[in-house]
Amino acid sequence: MRIAAAVLCGFFMDLCLGDPDWMPHPVIYMGKAISALEKFLRRKFPDTQKGLLMAGAALAAILPLGSFLIAAAVIYLAGLVHPVLAFLLETLWCWQALAVKGLYTESMRVKKKLEEQDLPGARSAVARIVGRDTQNLDAAGVAKAAIETVAENFSDGVAAPLFYLVIGGAPLGLCYKAINTMDSMVGYKNDRYLYFGRAAAKLDDVANYIPARISAFLMMFAALLTGQNAKHAFQIWKRDRYNHASPNSAQTESVAAGALDILLAGDAWYFGKLVKKPTIGENLRPVEAADIMRINRMMITASLIALVLFLAVRCVLCILL
């Protein structure tokens, strides 16, 4: 039951404390490892389509496996010193694998700037949590970007890490974070990463396939509990859940669009280039700053449901098996 207790404690530590700036975070070191491995692998493999695919596949194998093995070894060694030390370490990494408070804090900063009618400040705030160009977004565009980020990252930053933490503790949770970090750094379809980043992007799609779909239904239930349009959320999810280049990203975005009766996604600028993207949802009313609070209520409610559901399933399986 150590894993269940560590996940429970880690979740509420994240919910209350978020990620303090002074605390070293595993994702930072994963990012440094990705950069170093990319340089090394690009030197070792030929600069051809096949060579770049092989180099990217090597990265996609080394980083997640290495993250898992290092975490498992450190927890094991800590347990040899004292079981409490192993539990504290596992709790710490469970805490750091989750992003409930971070999502809430960053997105609500955007809401605050919009309510103050500080559009430049709102653009700067949303630029911290999205990959698109934000300098020309209007107020509705800024709010929409924040809503999309909270919806998508509920799966990537909360439900999926919880899913893997409950299955395999901190080692598997950090393995997932390594996959997710790789995708965010090299999983682009541009000249530099089209081939090198393909394995990382595909691995991220596989790792998120089940959690993303669970997340969609958790968000629907949360929409019902928070007074949003749960029926419309299901209808839009059923229609628009694949309106994205990723098979997973629109799963929760479509639920958010339906629950809030708004239109999300569509064309956006990335690195100075317009990227054509399908829309998600229906334009039943304008997007507003208050929708950021609404999606956060849904996200936090869905996070709590996920915690209870996943831990309950683990406990039942432990008893039966």
Q: How would you label these PLM feature ranges?
A:
Residues 1-175, 179, 187-321:
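Hydrophobic alpha-helical transmembrane segments
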Residues 184:
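Glycine-rich phosphate/dinucleotide-binding loop and adjoining beta-alpha-beta core of small-molecule
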